[in-house]
Amino acid sequence: MVRLGISIYGVSRKIRTGEISPIEAFEKICKMGAEVVELVPFGFNLVETPELKKDFKHASARLGVPIGNYSLNANFLMLTPEKYAAEMARVKQHIDMTSDMEIPTIRVDSAAFSRPMSENTIEKFEEELPLIVSTYEELCDYAKPLGITVLLENHGFHANGSERVRQILTSVKRDNFGHQLDVGNYTCVDDIPEIAAKKMISFAKTVHMKDFYLRPAHRDPGGAVEFNCENSWFRSVNGTFLRGSILAQGDIDIWDVMKTVKYSGFDGDIYLEYEGMEECEYGTYVSFSNMKRIYNEV
């Protein structure tokens, strides 16, 4: 059954500044009407603070809102063998934590978001694909006895784009591996979200609804900062200017994407992931209200 939820990432600015606690953030997005919540550990660490892990479980039970996914940044590429082993051990700790919290899925990246743009070529991707595949297979094998499904999100500028993501998904031969389809992130590699969603929805276990303003490379809006997707304009791999927006106020046809998701047979969780420059609680609230309305309209 489809559940409409919110990623805590949308209000993580206030967590990182200490304006609200992680539990207060969870409570706020539950009060916005989320049927399920995604945890993203920006401003907190559940592996290092077991008491906070308990607090989240208690808050989830008290409010009647489950935690459906845990989203973890990771990087397994361009590392020494020692650093690769350390990263694998770190991610496995987070898989253990996900199991302890009875969260069914964990999103794990293969490449760093801030990886140099010159290293994001198709030639480099094809060179690194065997390592990406073996990494996810090891993570899936570790996660399976714990009942956890590992998710690949189209995130960043390397393991992104419908063709690259499809290649990874079809190469990893594990039944507890799937796709977290992020509508907005496809624009980071100049993939067309409305078309990418149609290509990739059959692989999706969860969906991120996210919107961006888009400006062509020759129309510099000013203030762009490389890799800063939260507080400014930034650029795609081919120079398109991108800026996060309130859902349905940007340039992605959210109605078209939502129709694709709704009538595809998808029956997982749809999370609002707000990444705009507005005050983050306001931006998350309006975006989630729009997401619910559009889901019912299409």
Residue positions per predicted region:
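A structural motif
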Residues: 34, 98, 103, 204, ...
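Acidic/histidine-rich catalytic cores of soluble enzymes
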Residues: 19, 36-37, 67-70, 133-251
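Acidic-and-aromatic substrate-binding clefts and catalytic sites of carbohydrate-active enzymes
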Residues: 13-19, 40-52, 75-85, 114-118, ...
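Active-site acidic/histidine proton-transfer and metal-coordination neighborhood
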Residues: 15, 27, 55-66, 80-179, ...
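Catalytic domains of carbohydrate-active enzymes, especially glycoside hydrolases
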Residues: 21-42, 101-102
